[in-house]
Amino acid sequence: MNDKKKAVLVVSFGTSYEETRKKTIDQIENDMAEAFPSYAIYRAWTSDMIRAKLLKRDGIRIYNVCEALEAMAADGIQEVIVQPTHVINGIENDQMKADVAAYADRFMRVSIGTPVLTTAEDSKYVIDAIVKELHPAKDEALVLMGHGTEHYADAVYAALDYQFKDLEHSNIFMGTVEGYPTLESVMRLVQKAGYRHVVLAPFMIVAGDHANNDLAGDEEDSWKSVFEAAGFSVRCVLKGLGEYADIRKLLLSHAEKAMEQV
């Protein structure tokens, strides 16, 4: 119970990797608390699988969106700002909005912020943040691993790849684990461009299971192994987007815009 009547609900997919959670989701929430001292900060994760894993393994219970909103209503919160840490406006974000809509009448005011990549301006900002953070050498191909989805928002990844090239970052490539561009597609482009050195980095808020296994794992089908088998020298940077101060600032700005709409 708290005496604040306004709150920010920070909604993330979640992660079972404690180390990356502290550097990403926790840090985003801490930044929100610091930026908006008159708001209570609540947490919700959308992955039922990860929440169940944490409960079983660590005894830690994390609310889903509906449970968090229920708790906020019980705590007397009247104004709710929902800020997702999702990268795209995909399946998880659609479900989050549906859950919030179902609880909207429990509060006086509700406003929902947007995911990381929502506008063309967001994309430009994120590209600048990537370049600033990872600054690949001219003879290196920086290959980013996005999650990917069967949702139509998957088109954002290919659009971002195009925008990297349009902004003169011809050595930065975007791929996905579960959507398009595929690893095979990215590898063809990297080979065609003549690069021999590859830097792999996750394009996800946390550097969790996908980053540690699908990207940098020792299994023969990991991105690292596939590039190495094709003759590339590979360096992995296991840093989630949530570790980038500029990405956290972008999420803060999205929350601020949501507050202005209340």
Can you name each region flagged by the protein language model?
Residues 1-262:
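Active-site-proximal alpha-helix that buttresses catalytic centers in soluble enzyme cores
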